[in-house]
Amino acid sequence: MSYDVYYSTGGGSMVYGGSDVWVNNWLREVAPKLDYPSKLLIHRRRPDGKNVEFDTSIEILWQGDDPKKFNTYMNECRKLHILHGYYTPHKLITQNQDRLSSVVIHVSTDLSLKAGFQLGVPKLKHFSANPKWERQVSKMADKVIWIGLDKIPLHDEVDVIDIPNYYEFKNNLSCNESNVVGFAARCETRKAPHFLDGIDSLAFTDIKDWRWWRAHYKCMFEKTRLYQFNYKNIHRFYGRQDWGISHSCHLNEPFGYSIFQAFDYGKLPILQMDWIKDFKYPFRAFTKEQFKEQVDNISNLSVQERNDYLGDFREYLRRYDNKSEWSDKYLEIYNS
């Protein structure tokens, strides 16, 4: 029987970042409405000792469970759609480029790899990535989809379909009076975790990556309480009332689920200069020193003033609270 393959590197209850959140949204909102028989192929080993659950009825195969079947499914599919792929070349993609119908781009590696230079950080903390591959796979695919809010260099090289992610505001909490800063993100360079050094803060991230910053950038983080990231605890962390300012100062952020969560949970964020830059918002920073100044500025605000700033921006962000529109745009591509 003929079928389409949807290729990913993760998903289900195994969530490490925004791309996994995106895949789970796709499984819930798009997969049930696909017209053609389909399979989800996850190109990695299933984690040992972990039960990864999926909210979908679509057939799922992990590459590590049956490499031979995985390759057969890839090589014999009608169409291949990359939901989230690796940022370096792989022969399973290149040998099936004539089947490659679409690819979803979740981050601009071109911009992301420049973050260290832009922020003045001598050593780059980054996942394995090759910007040449991003361009190559985009040129192989019939359709290229970008999930972000702003244009990226790839827009100048290929035709790109812009389908920004969505976020549903379900909490709409008010700000509190805490001046403690919270950080809930991966520790790659463009997220600027070193901005927290010397600031009373909480960090909800990967402990191993956090130690990299202590070893390579000589951050002491003596005022930071560290909590190992586990996605099932994300809402508990944002719901805490012992922090009130969000370190959302992430450079070249494609969409920013964690930033939307900060607005949703009443954590007034400090943003980078480039995130929705057309919206007038006073609490932005580019350097570590500017970040500290903005922490001080917010600390001098009343709770009402914080709510006013947060509320105005949150209302603006509701334009991305559009789940049905988001899924319809993808279905138009996949069911065509």
Tell me the role of every PLM-derived stretch.
Residues 245-259, 272-281:
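Nucleotide-sugar-dependent
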Residues 18-25, 186-200:
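A conserved mid-protein helix/loop that constitutes part of the nucleotide-sugar donor-binding site
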Residues 63-69, 210-211, 215-216, 220-239:
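Conserved active-site histidine-acidic residue motif and adjacent donor-binding/catalytic loop
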Residues 18-21, 289-292, 300-336:
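A charged, aromatic-enriched C-terminal amphipathic alpha-helix characteristic of glycosyltransferases
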Residues 107-145, 239:
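Membrane-proximal helix-turn-helix segments that form the acceptor-binding/catalytic region
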Residues 109-111, 149-152, 159-173, 209-210, ...:
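Short beta-strand->alpha-helix junction loop in the catalytic core
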Residues 7-17, 21-67:
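N-terminal strand-loop element at the rim of the active site
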Residues 171-191, 200-202:
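Conserved donor-binding/catalytic core segment of Leloir-type glycosyltransferases
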